Amino acid sequence: MLFHAVGQSYRDRSHFDSQVVLEEGSSRPHALKSGWLNRTLQTTGGEGLSVSSEALLILQGAGRHFNWQPEPKFAAKPSFQSQVLEMLEGDPALATALAEGLRVREMAQVNSMSAKGNTIQQTLKGMAKLLRVPEGPEIAALDLGGWDTHSRQGRESGRFARVFSELSRGVATLRTELGSTWQDTVVACVTEFGRTVRPNGSGGTDHGTASATFLFGGGIRGGRVIADWPGLADHDLYEGRDLRPTRDVVAVLKGVLHEHLHLTEPQLAEVFPAHRALAPQLEILS
């Protein structure tokens, strides 16, 4: 399912501020002290996973969450890990943290992966193994870069085509590796802003406003493009340069939480306190 002409209520073109607003689920940067997925976990009581070396902002907060990423080429041997655990017996906090890390490592079971060969497909294989474990996380977040195509963007080939192909292969990998869990999974691909309608002088595009949001999953009512299309004529563009947003990305995210995780209106207000009046997008799931 694809939603087009989607944007945020915050219309700055700064990567940093726009990413903060998107991950906080707020209306301005640093307005909240937690991420909207973490507030979701506080509502559901589940556990979250950041596929990163440290917690992504979207999962930061009081809700239970942990971090995981594929191991580097020179991972510690089990015998060394056991020795370190013995050394830390006198420090319960450190010993508990290490034991938790080893538990996550064992669940992922991708320990032979080298840093050099770490593709998004390999990362998603490990992520899927964690998600399909019964006692594993309920929610996961992954940050994919490479979309800031100020130069040599290309069309059917080039930088943009490569990152889209990688995303496509990654989603296909996730679907395969999740197995039957895919039927109860929703994957949301969102971005902080789009690109300019016209190319720049370097064969790329600059920071824009509206873009597209993709939803995948076994229960998604797929095969549809949903948009209140604003047009691409000069007088239709936002500030004369960007695709104009006609749908708030938070409405789509609210719809996912409402239909997939069955959050009520008061709970949605707790997750997105700055967007209480925004109605959720409906009829996302079959």
Residue ranges: model-predicted function:
Residues F193-R224:
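Histidine-centered active-site microenvironments of extracellular/periplasmic hydrolases
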Residues V171, R175-S202:
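Metal-dependent active-site segment of extracytoplasmic phospho-/sulfohydrolases and closely related
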Residues M1-S180, A212-L215, G219, R224-S286:
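Feature for exported/extracytoplasmic and membrane-associated proteins, marking the mature portion
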